[in-house]
Amino acid sequence: MYFYVINNNLVKENKKHWERIYETKNIDGVSWFQKKPFTSLSLIEISNVNKDAEIIDVGCGKSFLIDNLLEKKYSKVSLLDISNNALKEVKSRTKNFPNSGVFYNSDILDFNPDASFDLWHDRAVFHFLTKSDEINKYVKICEKQINKNGYLIIGTFSENGPLKCSGLEIKKYSVENLKEVFSNSFKLVDHLNIDHVTPFD
């Protein structure tokens, strides 16, 4: 398996937190909003997965990544988010696109579907896992759910990033740290350092 790295400069409580965020904020009122997520789209295209590859966007929120992928004729785009509110909005927004992907309303650490994936995209979840047991469980889930020769595209805050995001503590990574976390089953193909510009900048 391979992975790309994008480096940016309690279950019930987590669910309540994210439901509140997506109930009270406009879609463009969060710092991670991107109408067209160019970096993610580029990395997915570079992976050269087929248009019918099983793709999942982990911690999708109300992201427009799925809209852009469906416009590009990817046909099996699944979403995972702890917020049912966010998933409902995205489902409504993309209902006119042909898509055989599944919308999973789950905490990532409880995620255990029958499906497996050719490409796993996460620019929103992993850095919120701050405890060793959570991180190890996430890695095990990736190892189980990503197909052999599949791709893991993961974005985290770099060592120069903030201490918190959306009011929650996060864990920051260097490329070497991230490489080590996933080293048992994944091989680093490439990494990027991105200065994320928020909608408020």
Short names for language-model regions:
Residues 118:
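Conserved acidic residues
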Residues 121:
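A conserved beta-strand element that flanks and buttresses the S-adenosyl-L-methionine
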